[in-house]
């Protein structure tokens, strides 16, 4: 079996237009000590055929296509398939800076006691793609690190996890629809060794087809209250939706102002927007390389 330092894991379903853009770039930039793991949820839009060809050509290392019970089920399968020492979740419609991800992975490889690395985050929406905002959970991390709170939340779009740490922090809870929110609370409540990177390894892209744009608000609220009690979560600004700042940004981008159909549509040809996203995240990290806060 090959030895991999870093596994990029993807769970997807019927998102070929986004997935093809993301995978094309990842495949182009992949290093020899890295693998790509893809779990498809039995897509019907051509995704299966596309991934099957990539797998036959040896461009992705592991691939299955079968129905998932829910979103977290698909991601759990992908994480369990990973063979790398470090696991990085790649969401099919978001943007990632792979050189910065490797910087985070190298830090974890050099510091075996670290379970998880999280970072600052960039946010944008397809309907106004040149407007990019920054978000951070650093103040919440500091509160937790200094034991002023038992748990805090963060999005999983920028998270790196040590594979061997899964036996301690667990996988996604398949009951929770706000799976990254619960996962973050659990990791911090368990006092996992979390390190904060002050750069940006990911850019979250909001659009009308994004999974997080269509959550059941009532169920999210009910499960949020449940998780709050489970993990003694004091709450902060993320409580607005009991999700993460990423979802708050999406909601504002999609439904603010006139709330018309024109505000939520985007071109099916997303190449221009994503080219801009990749350019900007690289520029931002070159201007501010970031550092690690232990």
Feature map (PLM): residue ranges:
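Cell-envelope/extracellular polymer assembly enzymes that use nucleotide-activated donors
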Residues: 4-7, 35, 182
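Short, acidic, metal-binding catalytic loop of nucleotide-sugar glycosyltransferases
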Residues: 24-33
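Short beta-strand/loop segment that forms part of the nucleotide-sugar
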Residues: 33-42, 64-67
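A conserved acidic beta->alpha catalytic loop
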Residues: 40-49, 91
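Glycine-rich, basic loop-to-helix element that forms the pyrophosphate-binding segment
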Residues: 66-82
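Short aromatic/hydrophobic "clamp" motif used to bind/position activated sugar donors
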Residues: 87
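Conserved donor NDP-sugar-binding/catalytic core segment of glycosyltransferases
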Residues: 99-132
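Conserved nucleotide-sugar donor-binding catalytic segment
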Residues: 141-219, 223
